[in-house]
């Protein structure tokens, strides 16, 4: 329950368990390019699935006119590293950040609603902050939505950017009427703010336009493929939002 009590069971001493199995893998090489001091940006995409991608599932689109709903995102998958069997244990939006940024499994009560979420934890943002990174989190929903604010602070994130921050600069015309700011303008805003962060920085961004009730801006209603489900058009909208984001910011160091 939300009381948050977790029973701690100890079956092995840490050194004994390491001798049996360790999930820590230390590669001999991290690749040709040095990674230390690089900016790190993690995009968490609402309701995205491998089945939306013609690159990941070409067999689904072999006989269809529409070749997937993520034509832009398919491009960096082909040009960069793409891990096809990488999973995070979160099944709902509220569980996404602890799963992706902290490798925290899903409990009966979402982690962000548990008292333990308020205590400092060694998650990716805090690890990088301890190495001198500025840390930020972007989401176009209201600041207190789904406990993200309290969670982000406990995870080591210093600065949160929300719907309120966007509207303070750009007004209220881009509110989708349900969850927050449409992905396209919010991604552009996030890029502006990331450009002003001290380097090196870590930033996480959570999209929202592909969430139920699956609506897109009027200007895009007739420009995007209908798809087989209501979500497909929203996925195509967010994919295009990323296209515009990378077109503007991909060349920045």
Residue map of PLM features:
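Soluble catalytic regions of membrane-associated enzymes that act on cell-envelope
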Residues: 1-253
């Amino acid at each position: 329950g939300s009381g948050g009590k977790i029973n701690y069971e100890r079956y092995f001493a840490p050194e004994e368990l390491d001798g049996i199995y360790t999930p820590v893998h230390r590669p001999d090489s991290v690749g040709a390019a040095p990674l230390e001091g690089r900016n790190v940006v993690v995009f968490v995409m609402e309701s995205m699935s491998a089945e939306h991608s013609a690159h990941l599932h070409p067999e689904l689109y072999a006989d269809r006119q529409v070749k997937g709903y993520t034509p832009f995102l398919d491009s960096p998958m082909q040009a960069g590293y793409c891990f096809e069997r990488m999973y995070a244990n979160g099944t709902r939006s509220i569980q996404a950040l602890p799963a992706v940024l902290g490798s925290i499994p899903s409990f009966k009560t979402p982690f962000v609603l548990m008292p333990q979420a308020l205590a400092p934890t060694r998650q990716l943002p805090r690890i990088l902050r301890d190495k001198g990174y500025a840390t930020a989190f972007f989401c176009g929903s209201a600041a207190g939505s789904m406990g993200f604010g309290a969670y982000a602070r406990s995870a080591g994130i210093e600065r949160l950017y929300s719907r309120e921050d966007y509207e303070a600069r750009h007004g209220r015309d881009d509110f989708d009427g349900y969850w927050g700011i449409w992905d396209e303008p919010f991604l552009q805003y996030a890029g502006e703010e990331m450009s002003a962060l001290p380097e090196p920085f870590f930033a996480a961004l959570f999209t929202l336009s592909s969430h139920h009730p699956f609506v897109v801006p009027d200007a895009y209603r007739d420009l995007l493929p209908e798809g087989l489900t209501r979500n497909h058009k929203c996925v195509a909208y967010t994919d295009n939002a990323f296209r515009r984001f990378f077109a503007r910011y991909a060349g920045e160091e």
